Amino acid sequence: MLCRSFNISQLAIPFVSVLISFLAYTSQLFFYYFEEAPLRSEEFWRLNIFAVCIWVCYYRACTVDPGRIPKDWTPPNLKQLEKDCAGGRQRWCRRCEAFKPPRAHHCKTCQRCIPKMDHHCPWTSNCVSHFTYPHFMRFLFYAVVGMGYLETLLFERASIVWASRHLPSYLGPGLGQLVHLFILLVVNSLTWLALFILLLRSIWSLALNTTTIESWEIERHETLLRRARHFGGYLSGPGGIQIRIKKQEFPYDIGIWSNIRAGMGGSANVLSWFWPFAATPDRSTGLEFEVNGFEDPNLSWPPPDPDRIPLPAKREDMSAAIAAADASYHRALQARNIQRSNDASHSGGHPIQRRKRFHDRFNENKAKERLSESESDFSDDEEVQDGEEGWKNSEGDRLRDFGVDEEAEFYDEEDIPLGILMQRRRQQ
């Protein structure tokens, strides 16, 4: 039973804790016995202050709740939501059975929608979100600065060893000390380099006010624009519908200063950005965000994606005249739609139809295969697990690499009318 419930990701936090302890404390043990250059008092205090800051920030990045969407939250503009749904901008999570605020995504690990989700970090076993992002940034900062300082101390001792390499061995450190120094240098250097690159990338994203997922969405949008140019500005969606693809500016880049302030909890106090015990952002925030006004404020992000539009709803085989005359038919149909939607969401329902990759569909259409367009757009091969949701950016990442539930982001059983979604929400 224990083996079945074990997941290797459960070792992430213990591994990081052991790594921090190894670098922070066994290094001091090495310095203590290194007679050629023992640890000075000011070096001792700096090392331990950095270690405390790293521990505090890492603990908070691991334990602070990444946030939840209030059960009673609904979009402020329902009329605009109707237009968004019609244009492929539906913000309804079929996993949570709730509306998704801007910048929220469904995390497959946390199993809920996360406000302003950046990614699910395996090393903290927690989502980096609107509420945990400041703690995550401070952890990266103090880890890079602390290990950078440790690197200078290790390099100083390594230089002493190298300078005395021609002296008799009994005049220098023992074999155990040399091995310890070598391991410390290698582990600290590699870890520092990896975290330094991650910190630079995170600072860049912070300055632009883009999450990791949104950077992926921006690159995806640019890819769709290139595809659409080949087809006169349009791409085909499910059922053969034509979707207009036009360039849309990222709406949340509001200036470097405002971007950094918003990402670090909303405070304009620069010192609080570096304070390990700084307060978590107010829990009432994270549902609405300031926009730059470059686009129509009613346009949502991400832009329309033909491969993220729900399948067109199936029509009942009954004439419009009979349907209009029979009110009970409408009530029964609505109840049946709600029940079918609930069954599909909670018990698996109908299997998800995955759209084939764009290039596969393009080649099939070009070759004029005998299948109809609606049939050839979707794959029935259960062994083909990667449809268009398997699209990767230039770095080889797809949405699931950031912890996002791809099925919840890309597919739905059918295009459920907004009225039915609202009624289903009230019945919960």
From Swiss-Prot:
Main location: endoplasmic reticulum
Cytoplasmic side of membrane: 1-10, 62-134, 199-428
The keyword Disulfide bond belongs to this UniProt entry's keyword annotation: no
Compartmental location: Endoplasmic reticulum membrane
InterPro entries named in the record: Palmitoyltrfase_DHHC, PFA4, PFA4/ZDH16/20/ERF2-like
Feature: compositional bias, Acidic residues: 374-388
UniProt remark on domains: The DHHC domain is required for palmitoyltransferase activity.
Protein purpose: Mediates the reversible addition of palmitate to target proteins, thereby regulating their membrane association and biological function.
Name listed for the protein in its UniProt record: Palmitoyltransferase pfa4
Organism this protein belongs to: Aspergillus fumigatus (strain ATCC MYA-4609 / CBS 101355 / FGSC A1100 / Af293) (Neosartorya fumigata)
